[in-house]
Amino acid sequence: GVEDFLFTSEWLNYPEEFVHHANDVVDYAWRALFFTNIKNGWVRNVKFSDWNDCIQIRKSVTMTIDSVEISGKRGHGSFMALSSTGILIKNAVDLVPAKVYANGGQRHGPALQSGSTGCVYQNIKMQKNQSIDCHGDYPYGHLMDNVHGGTFHQNGGSKLAYPNSGPDLVLWNFKHDSNFDKIQFDFWDLNKHQLHTYLKPKFIGFTSLDDKITFENEG
């Protein structure tokens, strides 16, 4: 496990700002923690300042990420569980500030990808208009519990990786906060390439701050 660390990087002093997929340097050059083939691991009480990518968990089971803070210069990813089962990420906050040309928070918020299942994001504070990230290749059967401050419009993944999420994505007490005055999220539009294509997501206790948000094709 990893406990009680502050991780910093030279991304802070790199002359370019983050632009999504502008080049491999701004996307991936400074990556903090990458776990693969781990069982019963943990990260606790850790801060990340100025990173392209903070935590990625691949081909692992039963890990816990608890009490994590992200801050500093905006980068690509925050948390990602891919090809993994039973990952709990809780009590995390993204404090990366907004700028004139960019939303606050890392480009991708809480993320799931590549057949991951049975993962939980709990008590997560996102920035306004920051998107959760169901990144395709069929993640399914996940819970987002008490996630505050984000939206759904900028999930990652190409058309070849569709849908962004498979069945049984449950969003429990999700508090939506975006820059939209009004928007309808159609989660299964067969005629349009959308970055929020989820198979019948389930919303329980959804609330929205000053937005007129409606859904179509939810569970």
Model-derived features with residue positions:
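Extracellular/periplasmic carbohydrate-active domains that bind, remodel
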Residues: G1-G219
